[in-house]
Regions:
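Enriched for short, Lys/Arg-rich terminal
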Residues: 2-9, 13, 20, 24, ...
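A short, compositionally biased N-terminal segment around positions ~18-40 that is enriched
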Residues: 17-33
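A short, surface-exposed loop/turn module that caps and links secondary-structure elements
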Residues: 28-52
Length: 84
């Protein structure tokens, strides 16, 4: 799993407890899945190609690269703001 600079910045702006919840989800649930799409939902429209994962009121947007077997964390934020 790789985390883009923007996503790291997004995570660093959150409260410590929210940071822990998101990192725990990424490391212990998402990264250990054989098929990460089982936990997420594909986005449509201008964000087509990205997948979203729900952690409380936060959303984690990722790009899944099957050829490299990698998950790129693109953006993290509150559900009201992350899709803008």
């Amino acid at each position: 799993m790789r985390v883009e600079k923007r996503a790291l910045k997004d995570i660093s702006r959150l409260q410590r407890s929210d940071q822990r919840r998101i990192v725990d989800f990424l490391e212990n649930r998402l990264a250990r899945r054989d098929n990460p799409r089982e936990l997420g939902e594909a986005l449509t429209g201008p964000l087509a190609g990205l997948w979203k994962y729900r952690v409380g009121s936060f959303r984690i947007l990722t790009r899944i690269d099957d050829s490299a077997l990698a998950i790129w964390v693109v953006q993290v934020g509150d559900r009201r703001e992350v899709y803008r």
